[in-house]
């Protein structure tokens, strides 16, 4: 935004869970309207426009209107947000797969997905936009057989100066959410990769946190032995 000339018009069209936001159809129509006036329009999104970002809907509207466009990929919060929290999305000692899901569908209701299949098939689950239905999601995961002591983390305002990370478990997270007043925007991760944060929280280390290498103790033994 700072690179754009000062006289460039800026229109806010962001979305925040649980707060008044522009309707998606109005955003798409506004982009088309401006483009038809001969304007060069930049639709700036957080994360990646094609990962739960509704970029596909807006691009489809442009196609229908016969307006050419380009897509510049970004770093989705399920990857970048966890990296800023010191939590790797994958690690060969913990998981060979990961599942990204959204906490609600197009109607705003909890996602009608097969939680049992996801729980059985994915060691790590990353949930976008989960806070509105977090109680239901936690219950779905527990009913699907995920253990109550499974590590879980909430990354709030990821990569921002006011970023906070709450480590918890599937069994205690609802109490911890209330205690710590966790609110959106938050990215939620469930799985053993959360435990790796004590050795990989690079941002915390910059502020004096002592990191503990518990990832490859056998490698450390070979190096020092």
Q: Model-predicted segments: where are they?
A:
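Hydrophobic packing residues within well-ordered alpha-helices of enzyme cores
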Residues: 1, 62, 81-82, 137, ...
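Class I S-adenosyl-L-methionine
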Residues: 1-75, 174
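Short, charged, surface-exposed secondary-structure boundary motifs
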Residues: 1-3, 19-26, 80-82, 109-110, ...
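Active-site catalytic pocket residues across diverse enzymes, especially alpha/beta-hydrolases
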Residues: 4, 85-86, 141, 145
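Active-site donor-binding loop signature of nucleotide-sugar glycosyltransferases
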Residues: 13-15, 102-103, 157
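Class I SAM-dependent methyltransferase SAM-binding "motif I" and its flanking Rossmann-like core
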Residues: 46-121, 164-167
């Amino acid at each position: 935004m700072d690179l754009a000339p000062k006289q460039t018009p800026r229109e806010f069209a962001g979305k925040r869970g649980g707060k008044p936001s522009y309707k998606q159809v109005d955003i798409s129509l506004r982009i088309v309207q401006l483009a038809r006036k001969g304007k060069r329009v930049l639709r700036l999104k957080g994360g990646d426009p094609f990962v739960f970002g509704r970029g596909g809907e807006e691009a489809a509207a442009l196609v229908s209107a016969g307006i050419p466009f380009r897509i510049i990929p970004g770093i989705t919060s399920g990857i970048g947000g966890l990296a800023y929290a010191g939590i790797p999305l994958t690690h060969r000692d913990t998981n060979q797969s990961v599942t990204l899901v959204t906490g609600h569908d197009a109607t705003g209701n909890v996602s009608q997905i097969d939680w049992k299949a996801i729980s059985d098939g994915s060691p790590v689950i990353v949930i976008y936009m989960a806070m509105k239905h977090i109680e239901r999601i936690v219950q779905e995961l527990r009913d699907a057989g995920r253990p109550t002591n499974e590590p879980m983390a909430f990354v709030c305002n990821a990569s921002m100066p006011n970023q906070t990370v709450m480590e918890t478990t599937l069994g205690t997270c609802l109490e911890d959410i209330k205690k710590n007043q966790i609110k959106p925007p938050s990215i939620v991760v469930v799985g053993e990769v959360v435990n790796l944060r004590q050795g990989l929280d690079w941002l915390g280390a910059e502020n004096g946190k002592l990191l503990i290498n518990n990832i490859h103790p056998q490698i450390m033994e070979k190096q020092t032995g």
